[in-house]
C-alpha cells in the first residue's frame, strides 16, 4: 500500500531571546544580532506538522486531522502561545531558541502522542 503525507498548520505567537549563556554580551550580539536583545523580541510563528503512513481502508485516514490538531494544541500551542520561550516553556529551557531548536523540541513533544509517523516539523517566523 502507498504511503501518503498529510500536513496540519497551526499558529502561535511567542517572545524569545537568542543567546548562549557561556558567551559575553558582545559575542552574543555579534553572532545573533538584534535577536540577542536583552529585552526580548517576538514572532508570529506558523507551524506545519507533517505525518505519513498508509491510508486506513475503513476510515480513509492516515490520521484524523482534527485529532492531530487537538494534540498539537494541547502539547504545543497551549504551552507556547503568548509565552516567553526562554522563561515560560518548560521544554525550551536551557535551549538556544533558534527556529531549528524550536522545531526539534516540538518534534520531541509530539512524537509519542501521534498515531502515525511524524515525518517533518516546519516552523516559520514570517
What are the language-model segments listed below?
Residues 1-120, 124:
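Charge-rich, low-complexity N-terminal segments
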Amino acid at each position: 500500500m502507498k504511503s501518503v503525507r498529510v500536513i496540519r498548520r497551526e499558529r502561535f505567537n511567542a517572545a524569545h531571546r537568542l543567546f548562549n549563556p557561556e558567551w559575553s554580551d558582545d559575542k552574543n550580539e555579534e553572532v545573533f544580532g538584534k535577536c540577542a536583545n536583552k529585552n526580548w523580541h517576538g514572532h508570529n510563528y506558523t507551524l506545519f506538522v507533517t505525518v505519513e503512513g498508509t491510508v486506513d481502508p475503513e476510515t480513509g485516514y492516515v490520521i484524523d486531522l482534527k485529532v492531530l490538531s487537538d494534540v498539537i494544541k494541547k502539547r504545543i500551542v497551549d504551552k507556547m502561545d503568548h509565552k516567553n520561550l526562554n522563561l515560560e516553556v518548560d521544554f525550551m529551557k536551557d535551549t538556544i531558541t533558534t527556529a531549528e531548536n524550536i522545531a526539534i523540541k516540538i518534534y520531541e513533544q509530539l512524537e509519542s502522542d501521534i498515531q502515525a509517523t511524524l515525518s517533518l516539523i516546519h516552523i516559520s517566523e514570517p
